[in-house]
């Protein structure tokens, strides 16, 4: 393989760039820096929201970041976002809310709101998520399921446009 043709390296954080303890090793940082010195752009693509990637940008300056499963891109100090339309998010969350004990999290530009407490993450717990959708731009809706059969039940009841 001719490495001189490589223009960019795009990596995930969790399970790829980071160790199991969520650290970035000195060796990895040195390797990324050597690639950059060869004119290669270093970027990350992650499901994490921007606020959860920022600690790693203090260890290494990434040329671009694709975060929140692609809902937000940060490149050269500029941000581009693809929000879920309010009506779509409202319809989706209302349909999900009809299922008792379904755990829902909304990711916005700056926060996460959930209808249940999540110990590992900083979230604002709020029973009714509709007012959040009305006032905030929603980047991502996460549905946390304990059982796979619940997913198939919920999917059958959702409009096809929401799959």
PLM region spans:
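A general structural motif
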Residues: 3-6, 39, 99-101, 136-138
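Asp-based phosphoryl-transfer active-site loop
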Residues: 5-22, 44
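Conserved residues at the C-terminal ends of beta-strands
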Residues: 12, 68, 144
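Conserved acidic, metal-coordinating active-site core of Asp-based
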Residues: 91, 95, 102-163
């Amino acid at each position: 393989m001719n490495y001189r043709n490589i223009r960019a390296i795009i990596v995930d954080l969790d399970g790829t760039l980071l160790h199991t303890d969520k650290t970035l090793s000195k060796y990895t940082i040195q390797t990324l820096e050597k690639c950059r010195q060869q004119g290669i752009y270093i970027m990350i693509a992650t499901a994490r929201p921007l606020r959860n990637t920022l600690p790693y940008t203090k260890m290494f300056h990434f040329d671009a970041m694709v975060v929140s499963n692609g809902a937000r891109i940060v490149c050269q100090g500029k941000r581009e976002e693809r929000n879920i339309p309010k009506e779509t998010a409202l319809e989706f969350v209302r349909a999900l809310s009809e299922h008792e004990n379904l755990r829902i999290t909304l990711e916005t530009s700056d926060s996460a709101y959930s209808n249940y407490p999540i110990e590992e993450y900083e979230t604002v717990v709020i029973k009714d998520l509709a007012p959040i959708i009305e006032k905030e731009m929603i980047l991502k809706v996460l549905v946390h399921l304990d059982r796979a059969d619940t997913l198939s039940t919920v999917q059958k009841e959702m409009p096809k446009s929401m799959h």
